[in-house]
Amino acid sequence: MEITTKSSTTTDDLNNNNNKTVTPIKSENSATGHTSPPNNSTTTTTSSTSAQPITVLPTEIIKTFEHLLRKSQRLFIGLRDLPQFGRQWQPFFQKTFELYTKLWKFQQQYRSILEDKSKYGLKRCEIGEIASKIGQLYYHYYLRTSDTNYLNESYIFYEAIRLRSYFKDVSLDKTPDMMVKQLRYYARFIVVCLLLNKKKVVFDLIEELLKHVNDYTKIYKPSDAQEWSLVLQEIFSFLQADQCATFSDTNQSPSLTNSGNIINNNSNSNNNNGEHTNNTVQSHRLNHLNCPSPPFPLESTQILQQAILVGSQQNQIKFSEITLDMFRMTQSLEYEPMSEAKENDMKLKQQLTALQQQQQQQAAEAKEKNNGTDQQNTTIPSQPLQQHLHHQQQQQQNGNGSGIKKRNPHKYLLYRPTISQILLFLSYSFKELGDNKAMLLYICADGFTNEDNHVNQHIQPPPSIQQETVPSLIDDSNTNIPITTTATATNPLYNKLFTKGLTLNMQKPSQAINSPTVNNNNNNTTTNVTVPTTTTTATNVTAQTTTTTTTTNSTSTSTTSNIPIYKYNEAPFNTKVESLYPMDLLPFCRKPFFLIVNSQSSDIFNELPTFNQPFVSLLSPQSIPKKLVSNLKCGNLFTFFLHDPISAFCDISCGNKIPSKTFNNISLLAQNSLEIISKLLFECVDLHPSFSFFLLDDFLRSFIIRFIFCHATFYLHKEFQDNIYQVKSNPPLPKSLLYNQSILKSIHQLVSELDVSDQFLGLNENRLVIHEN
């Protein structure tokens, strides 16, 4: 489908170069309907096969428009009931896209008649509402397909609504419902801009949203005023936590670094020292600059197909059911658009040229001053980066570069789900996996430990019946069945896998009424997850089965009333029914499985028995040093390292306010460190086959490399000299790799550049013994 629009020359235009044909985005298993951006001018669209325009009566136009509007609204509402998994939702989305395309073209063609107050009186805010729903359609299609092209399309519509001021006169019309729709539009637009790293637009939108919220509460004094204040507070907290890098420089603004695209925002200010402060944002989508490629002749293979991101932690920074950690993992699981990647490539080459000139000048001055003294410790090792760029150019010439479009893995974002919802999405993701494809589960949740007496009550029956045999409750015969619980009670693996777990969203407060540690406020939180309609049938079947079982047990109990029967379901352990245990994941390990856990109970996944399939788990520290807890306002530290190792390194050592020149230098040093780790991984002969399998995938390789970088940083940092502060993996990585001198020296180069040697141990300095599992 192709739609041609005429663009006016007024200030309402989306872009000055918008006089072109809008080509629909083609994607596999995607809707083909593509709608052009809103246009302020009255546009008449005619088919190329029509020789003359067809005259239509105004009454017929109004009747057709109302019919299309009602039908589109009905279809739009119906999309909420579609499950997020499977493929049955695709034809419904395609039908909705096509109808909204028809509706938008129709109102463009007959805009003058529809806006005539004597005929219909279509308001500009109503046009904006239609455009807002089209943008929302694209956004939800992005969530279901992980294709960032649809996210860009959503941004185009949302931006056009703002530039053409479709909601400008909402406050004058004094229609509270339309004002609420305007506020929701701003909230959705902010989410889209956050996902696209358009922070400059975000700051502008926040100012406008704050003004509109104040107007809304002042005029109508609504009951939901506090809810909108909470929305603003969440946005402010989210942006403050996501402000990864702040530069202080007197002469120059930050340049593009190899970590991603640096974008200046409007939050520039001058401090008391006269330094110019630039708050910047980095794009952390994957590209060949922040993820080293496999060595020749190996090539990257798309192994990761399904990803489930779970955020279920208390007091986590979030906005619109997306926590900061989920947001960062989402960014890390998407490829950077090719145009931006090429731009970063060119900028990096310019940086390398400038650094080489600087090094030559410094070397000449040092040689003249020190009579030829070796100054290798003060130079930037840019040679590996040059080799990397040369390798990338060869790959592109061979057709392995930009000529092949790589797909993002399909993602499910689950905010505070129940255990049944997690298992449901794991099952459908497992079902969709192809041959030699992998599934990733990232879960950030609080951990818990059952008390020893609770565990004993759960495992062992009362002492009065431990050594007895009880008659069978299945039939009326006198067959005796011995109770064998000794093996369960003394099984260390059972105690390891079931005495700890991860707390999820508690949906039934009655189950946790005896637990003093449960926060019942969690029950008010809703999860953006749709349960399939088959649940009703399953519930009915379960109810019938329960009734039958109760009758049978009642009959049998009357004949054996003298036998004490222990009711296991009344044990205090049942208060943790809404929890995730390691054994819950075992059935899904029949196919390649990649697990990332960020929790103080992450160690329980360190001994998970698996099938003969590739399996890797990256586990966070069990605790964070007390001196760093108060400074961690940027989300969970382990996830921060997997997302942006450079900013995370700065966060635990020197803070995030550093000169831009220093940040450019440490970015290149960190890139060199990641290159070293990548090279050692592929050269390691003792590497577990599971790691070797996952290393060929770009996303999983980047997580493994950043995990080793995180391990080396914690290993050398003075505050992390305890086993509970160390990251772990299952299967364990070889010690020859984790403690390789080349990796540790590259970390020390970063330490020297940041001048934080007092916080790190030397390479030959004694450290506490860290026990590796």
Curated annotation (Swiss-Prot):
Protein's cellular compartments: Nucleus; Cytoplasm
GO CC annotation, single: nucleus
A Pfam family the protein falls into: SCAI
Record function comment: May function as a transcriptional cofactor with a repressor activity.
Keywords: Cytoplasm, Nucleus, Repressor, Transcription, Transcription regulation
InterPro entries for the chain: SCAI
BP terms from Gene Ontology: DNA-templated transcription
Residue stretches in coiled coil: none
Chain segments carrying region Disordered: 1-51, 250-280, 353-408, 513-532
Family, similarity comment: Belongs to the SCAI family.
Name of the featured protein: Protein SCAI homolog
Biased composition (Low complexity): 1-23, 35-50, 258-274, 353-364, 383-397, 514-532
Composition bias, Polar residues: 24-34, 372-382
Domain of life: Eukaryota
Signal peptide: none
A single MF term (Gene Ontology): transcription corepressor activity
Chief place where the protein resides: nucleus
Organism (species): Dictyostelium discoideum
Entry keyword Repressor: yes
